[in-house]
């Protein structure tokens, strides 16, 4: 099994098969607009712009599960990301990342790379690095600066 077997709805409502990202290195991130870590969008965009021509993509999945820090609707989220951080990488519709109602992709991601003490995602901006075959290679804590992941991305490109 790999992440290529899942699909998710883009922020514009279009269903997107993750198999469309075969042969790409991915960084999948649960995001929020009203979090102290929200400025990480800037570094995520820098990584995307730096490596997109080499087969790298960031996939952002907004979630409101942590202290209601993503209260906006899909249009508000898309506008916020573009206006404040110039985000041009794919942003998906808001999802749940923990619990029985967690999106199947996040159930899979956490089963493949658990966190410290638990599989659960503890906060916004948890990051999962995916290789070109769709395998979950590494999980990064919310506090990990996206730029610090650069060497790991380059190894997979």
From Swiss-Prot:
Pfam families: GSHPx. SUPFAM superfamilies: Thioredoxin-like. Its EC number is 1.-.-.-. InterPro entries: Glutathione_peroxidase, GPX_AS, GPX_CS, Thioredoxin-like_sf. Keywords: Oxidoreductase, Peroxidase. GO terms for molecular function: peroxidase activity. It comes from the Bacteria. Signal peptide: none annotated. PROSITE patterns: GLUTATHIONE_PEROXID_1, GLUTATHIONE_PEROXID_2, GLUTATHIONE_PEROXID_3. It is an enzyme of class 1 (oxidoreductase). Belongs to the glutathione peroxidase family. This is Glutathione peroxidase homolog BsaA. The lineage of its organism: Bacteria, Bacillati, Bacillota, Bacilli, Bacillales.
